[in-house]
């Protein structure tokens, strides 16, 4: 059965094309710096937003029209979604997809029944993977939707819930390995608190670390060689989440001796919810060798929640890819479109239009970022700006030779301090030149 009959194979036609079902900037086979653009970007489709989101919001009923809506049995729906998914993957020619365990198969009455459902759908996906060019970027477990996780999963006050969450992650790790997943993600949507009046924060954080160590041990036991990732987010659905931002997660991993096993999966909209630029989170992760993968989306700056829009801001995609290029490119990670069509964009074809928009935006951003890095535009300015640390007293500070006494002596004998302009306006103008040069 063909689920998206009105959508052709999506191909590159160039920036002058008026075809909505064509790439304008993303030419997957274009060679840049010795390898195809598709290998630089490593695009991925998010199974949840693309195939399970129905358009429900706190004020209204579902709006999405999907070709599998006529099915009523949850397993029939799950099977139809797999068929539709691989049709979409093929027509978009994306190299990867990501999933939660509960995205691909429905939850049963018991954990055994749920695992049986998973086994059925995983077997079906494995058959598709034998002939598909699309592979699994990462898998994860949904430890936030079911009411059992009302108080958290690994940080729940109820040890029975901790045990259930462990069993669920055990199974999710197994199927991610079985499907050839290159990474495994932890996102703690319910790992946090609503009020400290009823919260043992110390125990919760200790338990979260215990949980992650158990995951590492089991992954090693079964031979899973994928990269473990944690995805920071400051809030929503929980008031305060422990994985608040890149720095918070890094500190947590360092404290509990987990940093050698984990990297970060940075999401644009989560960064803005934490009060940071997307580039800030990427930069922090990169300079600490913690940048593993990216959830590509954007938020609405006028709204205070996670809108998960398709990324269409070229400035944002350029600065994001600047950080990726500066780190030497992705290893096992990629650009996963953790994005959903708007509630009013309810037609099946909109799923393709959203991905085309995001893929074009990141392709354009990559090309601009590559030129910025190659030309050393910002590097030269930064090198000049900090040159005082390469000579004289600055070199002594950096080398560790200086101390408060020597610095005081220097300051007493150097009464005149001269600062130079940061030239922010000039640099932003230069960035615009590169953005609009094509």
Swiss-Prot record:
Domain of life: Bacteria
GO cellular component terms attached to this protein's record: cytoplasm
Cell compartments where the protein resides: Cytoplasm
Keywords for the protein's UniProt record, in alphabetical order: Carbohydrate metabolism, Cytoplasm, Isomerase, Magnesium, Metal-binding, Xylose metabolism
Pfam families xrefs: AP_endonuc_2
Active site per the UniProt annotation: 100, 103
Cofactor(s) needed for function: Mg(2+)
Entry binding sites for Mg(2+) 1: 231, 267, 295, 338
GO biological process: D-xylose metabolic process
PROSITE patterns recorded: XYLOSE_ISOMERASE
List of residues binding Mg(2+) 2: 267, 270, 306, 308
Catalysis performed (reactions): alpha-D-xylose = alpha-D-xylulofuranose
Cofactor note text: Binds 2 magnesium ions per subunit.
One annotated GO molecular function: magnesium ion binding
EC top class named in words: isomerase
EC number: 5.3.1.5
Main location per the UniProt record: cytoplasm
Subunit-level organization: Homotetramer.
UniProt record similarity statement: Belongs to the xylose isomerase family.
This protein's name: Xylose isomerase
Organism: Thermoanaerobacter pseudethanolicus (strain ATCC 33223 / 39E) (Clostridium thermohydrosulfuricum)
């Amino acid at each position: 059965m063909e689920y998206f009959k009105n959508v052709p194979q999506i191909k590159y036609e160039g920036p002058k094309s008026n075809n909505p079902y064509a790439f304008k900037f993303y030419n997957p086979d274009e060679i840049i710096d010795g390898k195809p653009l598709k290998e630089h970007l490593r695009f991925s489709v998010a199974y949840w937003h693309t195939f399970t989101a129905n358009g429900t919001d706190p004020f209204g009923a579902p709006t999405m029209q999907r070709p599998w809506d006529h099915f009523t049995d949850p397993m029939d729906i799950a099977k139809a979604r797999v068929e539709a998914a691989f049709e979409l993957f093929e027509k978009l020619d994306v190299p990867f997809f990501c999933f939660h365990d509960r995205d691909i198969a429905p939850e049963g009455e018991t954990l055994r029944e749920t695992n049986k459902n998973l086994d059925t759908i995983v077997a079906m996906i494995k058959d598709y993977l034998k002939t598909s060019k699309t592979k699994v970027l990462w898998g994860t477990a949904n430890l936030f939707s079911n009411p059992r996780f009302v108080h958290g999963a690994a940080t729940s006050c109820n040890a029975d819930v901790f045990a259930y969450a462990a069993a669920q992650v055990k199974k999710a790790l197994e199927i991610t390995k079985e499907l050839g997943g290159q990474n495994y993600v932890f996102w703690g949507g319910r790992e946090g608190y609503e009020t400290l009046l009823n919260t043992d924060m110390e125990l919760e954080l200790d338990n979260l670390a215990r949980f992650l160590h158990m995951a590492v041990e089991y992954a090693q036991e079964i031979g899973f060689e994928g990269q473990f990732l944690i995805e920071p987010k400051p809030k929503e659905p929980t008031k305060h989440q422990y994985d608040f931002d890149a720095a918070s997660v890094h500190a947590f991993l360092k404290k509990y001796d987990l940093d050698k096993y984990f990297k970060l999966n940075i999401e644009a909209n989560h960064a803005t919810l934490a009060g940071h630029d997307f580039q800030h989170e990427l930069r922090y992760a990169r300079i600490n060798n913690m940048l593993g993968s990216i959830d590509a989306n954007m938020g609405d700056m006028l709204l205070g929640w996670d809108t998960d829009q398709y990324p269409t801001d070229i400035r944002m995609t350029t600065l994001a890819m600047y950080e990726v290029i500066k780190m030497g490119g992705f290893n096992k990670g990629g650009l996963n479109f953790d994005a959903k069509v708007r509630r009013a964009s309810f037609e099946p074809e909109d799923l393709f239009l959203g991905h085309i928009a995001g893929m074009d935006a990141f392709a354009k951003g990559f090309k601009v970022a590559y030129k910025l890095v190659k030309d050393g535009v910002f590097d030269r300015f930064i090198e000049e700006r900090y040159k005082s640390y390469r000579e004289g007293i600055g070199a002594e500070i950096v080398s560790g030779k200086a101390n408060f006494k020597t610095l005081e002596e220097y300051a007493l004998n150097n009464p005149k301090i001269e600062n130079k302009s940061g030239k922010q306006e000039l640099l932003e103008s230069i960035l615009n030149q590169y953005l609009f040069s094509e």
